[in-house]
């Protein structure tokens, strides 16, 4: 018999499940360009879609790695046998995914690349991918013992109002270097896309669309229009009186 739980408890349980799942996959698939997870619950099973830039690494040789992840998720969250399925989906535009770019910057810094050069490289790649604007902040012991932060901005970025919720993609990551821990924050402002593939369908409130006027077709020959009732017959010529 199914246990009845209140809607409030169900929402909390779903939120905790997704947060724990996201944390686990972030730890396991950090090197494979992990960019997020979607959970779809159907009457028969639960489908978990893993978004990543390198899906082949997530799947593994002959699907071995995805089967291992499925077994771990099934055991950890107490799913019945065969009721959970994991899929790997490639991120459509890597340059518009804040998580993917934060991870990319993290590995650049771990590889010993200078902070300024690494940040400008990420900034350029994001803008070339079609973003409306972006902001990269790196904070920590960048030079010397005193901690400071460096901010790199390009394009347009909104900071307040409801459009921030669906126009700005944000990601925070931490990287442990020899001098200490650096914090990485990446914010990407997505472009307006009526199809909803690379950005939100809803335009910004201050967006103005200018409609091009239609070309007016000028008449080549003069046309007279008769308005009102029936046309009157032409007047008969009057005889000229003779003296």
Swiss-Prot record:
GO terms for molecular function: class I DNA-(apurinic or apyrimidinic site) endonuclease activity; damaged DNA binding; DNA binding; DNA endonuclease activity; DNA-(apurinic or apyrimidinic site) endonuclease activity; DNA-binding transcription factor binding; enzyme binding; Hsp70 protein binding. It is a peripheral membrane protein. InterPro entries: KH_dom-like_a/b, KH_dom_type_2, KH_sf_prok-type, Ribosomal_S3_C_sf, Ribosomal_uS3_C, Ribosomal_uS3_CS, Ribosomal_uS3_euk/arc. Component of the 40S small ribosomal subunit. Identified in a IGF2BP1-dependent mRNP granule complex containing untranslated mRNAs. Interacts with HNRPD. Interacts with PRMT1; the interaction methylates RPS3. Interacts with SUMO1; the interaction sumoylates RPS3. Interacts with UBC9. Interacts with CDK1; the interaction phosphorylates RPS3. Interacts with PRKCD; the interaction phosphorylates RPS3. Interacts with PKB/AKT; the interaction phosphorylates RPS3. Its EC number is 4.2.99.18. The keyword Transit peptide does not apply. NCBIfam families: PRK04191.1 (NF003219), uS3_euk_arch (TIGR01008). Signal peptide: none annotated. Gene3D superfamilies: 3.30.300.20, Ribosomal protein S3, C-terminal domain. It is found in: Cytoplasm; Nucleus; Nucleus, Nucleolus; Mitochondrion inner membrane. Residues 231-243 have a biased composition (Pro residues). The modification N6-succinyllysine is found at residue 132. Transmembrane segments: none annotated. This is Small ribosomal subunit protein uS3. CDD domains: KH-II_40S_S3. The gene is Rps3. Belongs to the universal ribosomal protein uS3 family. The modification Asymmetric dimethylarginine is found at residues 64-65, 67. There is a cross-link at residues 90, 202, 214 (Glycyl lysine isopeptide (Lys-Gly) (interchain with G-Cter in ubiquitin)). The modification N-acetylalanine is found at residue 2. Methylation by PRMT1 is required for import into the nucleolus and for ribosome assembly. Residues 21-92 form the KH type-2 domain. The modification Phosphothreonine is found at residues 42, 70, 220-221, 242.
């Amino acid at each position: 018999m199914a246990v009845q739980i209140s809607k409030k408890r169900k929402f909390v349980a779903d939120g905790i499940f997704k947060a724990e799942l996201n944390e686990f996959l972030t730890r396991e698939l950090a090197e494979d360009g992990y960019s997020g997870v979607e959970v779809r619950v159907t009457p028969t099973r639960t489908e978990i879609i893993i978004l990543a830039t390198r899906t082949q690494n997530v799947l593994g040789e002959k699907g071995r790695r995805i089967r291992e992840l499925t077994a771990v998720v099934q055991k950890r969250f107490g799913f019945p046998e065969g009721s959970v399925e994991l899929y790997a989906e490639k991120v459509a535009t890597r340059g518009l995914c804040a998580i993917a770019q934060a991870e990319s910057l993290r590995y650049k810094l771990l590889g010993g690349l200078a902070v300024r050069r690494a940040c400008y490289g990420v900034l350029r790649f994001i803008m070339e991918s079609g973003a409306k604007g972006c902001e990269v902040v790196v904070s920590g012991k960048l030079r010397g013992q005193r901690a400071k932060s460096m901010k790199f901005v390009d394009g347009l970025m909104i900071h307040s109002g409801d459009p921030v919720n669906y126009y700005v993609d944000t990601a925070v990551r931490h990287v442990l270097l020899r001098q200490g821990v650096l914090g990485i924050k990446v914010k990407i402002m997505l472009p307006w896309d009526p199809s909803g593939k690379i950005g939100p369908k809803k335009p910004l409130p201050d967006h103005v669309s200018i409609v091009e006027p239609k070309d007016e077709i000028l008449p080549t020959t003069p046309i007279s229009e008769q308005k009102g009732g029936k046309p009157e017959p032409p007047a008969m010529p009057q005889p000229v009186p003779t003296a």
